[in-house]
Amino acid sequence: MAHISRTAYANMFGPTTGDRLRLADTELFLEVEKDFTTYGEEVKFGGGKVIRDGMGQSQVVNSECVDVVITNALILDHWGIVKADIGIKDGRIFGIGKAGNPDVQPNVDIVVGPATEVVAGEGKIITAGGVDTHIHFICPQQAEEGLTSGVTTFIGGGTGPVAGTNATTVTPGIWNIHRMLEAVDDLPINVGLFGKGCVSKPEALREQIEAGAMGLKIHEDWGATPAAIHNCLNVADEMDIQIAIHSDTLNEGGFYEETVKAIGDRVIHVFHTEGAGGGHAPDVIKSVGEPNILPASTNPTMPYTINTVDEHLDMLMVCHHLDPSIPEDVAFAESRIRRETIAAEDILHDMGAISVMSSDSQAMGRVGEVIIRTWQCANKMKLQRGILEGDNEHNDNERIKRYVAKYTINPAIAHGISHEVGSVEKGKLADLVLWNPAFFGVKPALVMKSGLVAYAPMGDINAAIPTPQPVHYRPMFACYGKAKFKSSMIFLSQASIEAGVPEKLNLQSQIGEVKGCRNISKKSMIHNSYTPNIELDSQTYEVKADGVPLVCEPATELPMAQRYFLF
């Protein structure tokens, strides 16, 4: 039997079972748990390599082989960290296993044929495209920024750079919803829209859902009253959609307890649970302990650093249409910025008590930094809290799975789209992100939408090869022509699909049906379902989880930052 050293094998085919990789410049290390390929029968493309006629490539016709194969990929997902080939057919993940030619190779379950394109996954980490559930649709250029960061799905609301959208993720009413659906149809990213949920009678809510809203948003700037909350959730239960809420910072319509009473035992997605982004001051963070609340963070407070508090006041004044010359407006802003709850937020994420990460794009948050901020927090917590339960001195696999779930599968589950996106699993859209380990979480090597490359770093177009400087991200073929419609999906409520909205608006993108939003709970949040008893001191803002104070120092230095960016 022939032998090869681990180093030589990793250089040729990528890491295998037991090998370890460092994520970017963090102190996080993954270890490969399983290898689905067959030693000695690996497939690889190139001169003198395996994927050639009669060798790793079979003779079958188009219908019997995959359209795309990603060879020797290291998959990092909530369900595992494994080495495998990934087959893609008709824009969806066909299989995860062993690719090749079954005529001459054993254990092949992904057939490579004349119709198969090859993406080299050797030495790359593959994750599912991110799902950002807190998008203010202030400008369409956010799609490019999000895609080039590794996010492939936007959920939120808005109509452009106007006061309502700068403050709230709401696309209100039939006309606005229809115009925005027609607009986002042209974007190479998956999109779902929130209607306005701040209504105390059901008719205005039903018509928005029937018009194409995939969910509804309750926001204090439109009135987050107990009556609106109760009514909105009634309609959600009736029409199987999710409700997102930014609760009442000023406690004008009621205190935290009144909001919880209005919610009852029904599921709801609470945005920026820490509170700097808005919500009952100072105790909205207690919602982390509710079994029917799906808690989320937005990225401006993540992770807690020496600069976090100072930058927030001015951001808040701009986003919520406040005037620094009005004392009441300044007091409103200051009531939301609390060092103690911001520090506790990091720890709650590490405990798996906050389930989702999102951006709050251009409305205090940064649309291109959801993934970076998630891993910066994971790194900060490892340095400050040590090895997570289930991990060891050799790897951080459990912590890594917990954090990747926050921006992939959990937001997809929360909004009823996990049957389409959110993980690297058979049958789902092939929205995949390839990373060089040294650039993991920072700068993707390839961003694929439905199996076709949407964005990639590309060098001088007039150069003899693709790599000469200047290298920067450019849109690829999934962003052009009719291909962009086949590569992206618009998520709609079941009621709007039945009402024929896609046909009435002549939407050309794929249509995804929102379903299963009302039968979930905090327990549905993978690796992030911990529901501690949260206590908050209203005078000192000290936060306790199950009686233990949640205290950590602000970071003075972060990975995935200046080492990778000039600006």
Curated annotation (Swiss-Prot):
Swiss-Prot/TrEMBL GO biological process terms: urea catabolic process
Residues involved in Ni(2+) 1 binding: H134, H136, K217, D360
Catalysed reaction equations from the record: urea + 2 H2O + H(+) = hydrogencarbonate + 2 NH4(+)
Top-level taxon: Bacteria
Residues reported to bind Ni(2+) 2: K217, H246, H272
Family matches, as PANTHER family: UREASE
Subunit structure: Heterotrimer of UreA (gamma), UreB (beta) and UreC (alpha) subunits. Three heterotrimers associate to form the active enzyme.
Protein name: Urease subunit alpha
